[in-house]
Structures are given as structure tokens and as C-alpha cells.
């Protein structure tokens, strides 16, 4: 057994049926797996069991996290008052997130079961072994675990389709929350009752904050940071700051400015202009970032009436902007900046100021920029594409998300 926060204790009693299986960990230990359901539902649990075993194998391979007990159980009942809960060794689910059969379940149902089973299992390390110091730090476990379950679903299915689905949810539900009277930072400053913490900003935008750090550090760098985080804080109740510090220290990468994502609310806006110089054969991207006023926080990059100003003054975000350049046929162009060729035909530009310029060299014709590839930051992007340029991106861009976005 391992120490756990008191909120993770669970005990279930009832008339239940059980599906059993076994999983062998990377170190050779055998773990007994049990899924308990109400009578008559047993035949619809096989997909959930497969998803659980896939989750356990994936977490070992991707993050080096092995399950720590000899028994893992799931209980699914029809009247559980939430979707699912990661109680240590005994996850509790609403039946709709466990049961699936070809006769009644859609592809979306199957994907949802797979994703939520993974999410609750992944909490064993990001939430249980390392938990939150207080509920203001909720995104420490939820934003991180949403990122992990998104990556799992992307690896199990279509990465592009998963990203499109995640961004659709963000834009349709979290962006309005960011723009409304209930707007709050990923790490909230205050609350009236505990449900105020369980928001799309804490979960979904929190996952985007984790994803941006993954983009800035790269897969290997992010894994190094995660390993250090677990090494330092296993068995502890910690903060978002502790997580960011582990990523910083493992990679010698300064994330001081990036921390503003945890304290500043609202959806940033990027306004981008592209200018081609035929004589110099250069293409310049001018990027301006701004963020609107939100409750209790004054925005930047815009004019304000004096009476609307608050004590909290937002500042420029640090964010990754993935881009590529296409020729008139839609072929990717080699990238060269400041006299240096860039390895590959995609570059991650790091934005840190309200206004910046990036100059690409040795271009014989005006390129078409493919901007914010894979939706590399949770922002509103504005660029003056023509219909012809959008059609070209939609049909020829190598970035599948941007092909969908341009359509």
C-alpha cells in the first residue's frame, strides 16, 4: 500500500457481477483487474477492460509509470452522481462510461469509454501518488491528466481527429467561459463553493497549458521533467508551481513568464500580418498579441476607459506558435532565419512580447503561411487569408489540423 489523501478512500457494497482479467507490468508483476457492474450488464464490460489494459501499457511506455498495487478495481453503477472518480485502487464510474456493446454504442461512445477509463487510471500517478496541496491547485492533477488522456486517445486512434475533437470542445465551451462573467484563471483566486473549481478552464484550458510546455520542451524534455516531478514529489501534496519548476530544472529552461497562464484569465488574441519583400527575398510575419478585460483583471493590447481599470494588469503571454510555409502549389518550403537553415519544414516560434517580427529568408516568391499548426496555443488567431489560400491549405497542407481548419 501507499499513502493516499483521505478523499481517495472508497468502499462499495452491493449486488454486483464481476469481470476479471490480469495484466503483467513491465517489471513482471501480475495485477488482478476487476470490473464490477449491476446484474445484467456484464457482457458490455469487455471494451472497458481492454481500455484499462491499454491504459496501463501506455502509461508504462510513454511515461514510465507502472501500477503500484496487485489489484485494480472499477465499480460501475447507474446512479453514481458524477461521471467517474479515481479512488485509489477502486475507481467508481457511472455505468454510461463503462458499458458499451456494438448493438447500442456508437464510435463516439466507444472512444468516450476508452478515454475516461484511461483518465481515471492515469490519476493513480497524477493525482493520487502526487496530489494537490489545496483545491486552488486542482489543474495540477486535472489539467495534466486531461493532457495525458488526450495523448493516449491520440495514440490509440487518429491523432488529427482527436486534436480536432479537443479543440472543438475548447472553442465551443471553454472560450465562452473565458469571455463571460465567470471567467477565471487556470489556477483560480477564489471560490464560493467547491463546484466552482470543476470548470472547463481548470480541466481543458489546463490541459492546453500542459500541452504548450510539452511543445516548448519537446517530448524528451517533457518526459525528463515529468520524471523529476515524480522523483521529487511522490507521496506529497504540491502546487502547480512545483510542477512547472520540475520541468524548468530538468531542462534548464526558463518558464517564469509562462507562469502567467496560471494567473491570467481570458483567451489571448493573435493578429498576424505577412509581408513579402521581393528585393530582399524575405517574408516577415508581424505578430501582435492582446488579451481582453476579464472580471478583476485589466487586459493588454487595447484601449481602456480609466474607470474600467483594475488593480490586476495583465502582461504578455509566453506561447508557442507552430508554423510552416507553403509554395503556390502547396509544397512545404525550407525555412531559414537569421542566416541559419532550420532542420525540417516546420518551426515553433516563441512569442513573449506584445509585438514581434519574424523574418524568413531566401524565398523567391511570396509563401503562404500555415499558422498555429496542431493548434499549438489556446488563442484566437486572425490572419487575412484569401479564399484561394485557404483552399490550398485545405487540400495540400501537411498539418492535418490546419487542413481541417481551413476547410
Summary of predicted features, one role per range:
Residues 4-6, 20, 55, 122, ...:
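Intrinsically disordered regions, especially transient/low-confidence alpha-helical propensity segments
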